[in-house]
UniProtKB/Swiss-Prot annotation:
Keyword vocabulary terms for this entry: Capsid protein, Late protein, Viral capsid assembly, Viral genome ejection through host cell envelope, Viral genome packaging, Viral long flexible tail ejection system, Viral penetration into host cytoplasm, Viral release from host cell, Virion, Virus entry into host cell
Region annotated Disordered, chain positions: 379-403
Site (Cleavage): K10, L11
Protein's name in the database: Portal protein
Family designation: Belongs to the phage portal family.
């Protein structure tokens, strides 16, 4: 059996059916204009999205050993790949901008695309990209703006979780912001109602009754007087004097400006946005030193790291190197210096690491002392302080019970 025949027999027989179910990927962010307006105008959405994007962009990547597998990008050296992922992806863009563009697409569109030209990495906007499935393998090609076709060995494809039309999707990712579009629209309608309510100069919850029959001219005159005397847009609020048998009473549930706050509903919408983006709400509301640190760690371990693992998995598949996220240089996860020093001191005194290794962990220069490069053997303070604990001490050798 030849190599090509072996490959043909190993292809997934069900791929043709999978391709027929979804021949071309579709955009899950179905209301991009609404999403864009919400990102630019709604504070909580802007803040949570930027927290995820900026936090993910702070993480670097570690390039490990090369796997013995067939990859799309051949001949790339470890140092070159490390430079592309951590210093400069291409001659025209810094690494922070590149990372933020990729994470933003993954967050808002559910997919991200990186173009590999053989020497550099370039971000390709996910909103304009389509994936065409293949009947035998996985992906046939990538189509950008219905004009440019990319081969599968030119695009690094990163896809978020998705469940479309009752089945998993291989080529479409689920936009995270799309899950809160309904909440954002309801929130916008509430605030628009409040704004129009005030702009129209409405008298809150007030209706006038009279036993007398007023003609059309008198009613219009009275309405004009009320609009002049009680207009929130102009700040008019004169004392209302009723005569001619007129009585005032509320006519709606909105009896004061406090009823227009929608505080509980707005808080519910804010919570939904935090849940969708995976941001602990305490990081936005503020807390104390006891709960801020655990929630920052929770945010990274449950939101940022899983997202970056999707990215590094695609990079590993494309380049063939073991690539992992590195959070060591993230300022928010830096351990307390005093606690770290005590921990390292304990490791040195118990013979786990050397003194200079501990200094290296603290970003200190090594000392030119022979003892600092040796493992310290702990003293047996419970016994005779010599030998191994449990094997020394007790009755002296050569003595008898009668001595």
């Amino acid at each position: 059996m030849g190599f090509k025949s072996w490959i043909t027999e190993k292809l997934n027989p069900g791929q043709r059916i999978i391709r027929d179910m979804e021949p071309v990927s579709h955009r899950t962010n179905r209301k991009p204009f609404t999403t864009g307006q919400a990102y630019s105008k709604i504070e909580i959405l802007n803040r949570t999205a930027n927290m995820v994007i900026d936090s993910a962009a702070e993480c670097s990547y570690t390039v490990g050993d090369k796997y013995n597998i067939v990859t799309y990008a051949n001949g790339v050296k470890t140092k070159t790949l490390d430079t592309l992922l951590n210093v400069r992806p291409n001659p025209f863009m810094d690494i922070s901008t590149f990372r933020r563009l990729v994470v933003t697409d993954l967050l808002f569109e559910g997919c991200a695309y990186i173009y590999w030209d053989g020497t550099s990495l370039y971000h390709v906007p996910a909103a304009l990209m389509q994936v065409e499935a293949d009947a035998n393998k996985f992906i046939k090609k990538f189509i950008f703006n219905n004009q440019i076709n990319y081969r599968v060995d030119e695009i690094i494809f990163i896809k978020d979780n998705s469940y479309v039309c009752g089945t998993n999707s291989q080529i479409s990712g689920q936009s995270r912001v799309a899950t809160v579009i309904d909440s954002l629209e309801k929130r916008s309608k509430m605030l628009n109602f409040k704004e129009k309510f005030l702009d129209n100069g409405t008298v809150i919850g007030l209706i006038l009754e009279t036993d007398e029959i007023l003609n059309k001219k008198l009613r219009e005159r009275k309405q004009e007087e009320l609009q002049l005397d009680y207009n929130p847009s102009t700040g008019q609020s004169s004392v209302l004097i009723l005569d001619g048998g007129m009585k005032a009473k509320p006519y709606s549930q909105i009896s004061s400006f406090k009823d227009l706050d929608f505080k509980e509903d707005i808080e519910g919408f804010n919570k939904s946005i935090c849940l969708a983006f995976g941001v602990p709400q305490v990081l936005l509301d503020g807390g104390n030193n006891a709960n801020i640190r655990p929630n920052i760690e929770l945010f990274y371990y449950m939101t940022i790291i899983p997202m970056l693992n999707k990215l590094t998995s695609s990079l590993t598949f494309f380049f063939g190197y073991k690539i992992t996220p590195n959070t060591k240089e993230v300022a928010a996860l830096t351990p307390d210096k005093e606690a770290e020093a005590k921990h390292l001191t304990s490791l040195v005194n118990n013979g786990i690491i050397t003194g200079n290794e501990a200094r290296s962990e603290l970003n200190l220069e090594p000392l030119d002392d022979e003892q600092m490069n040796k493992i310290r053997i702990p003293a047996n303070v419970a016994g005779s302080a010599t030998g191994v604990s449990g094997q020394e001490g007790g009755r002296p050798k050569g003595s008898t019970e009668g001595d």
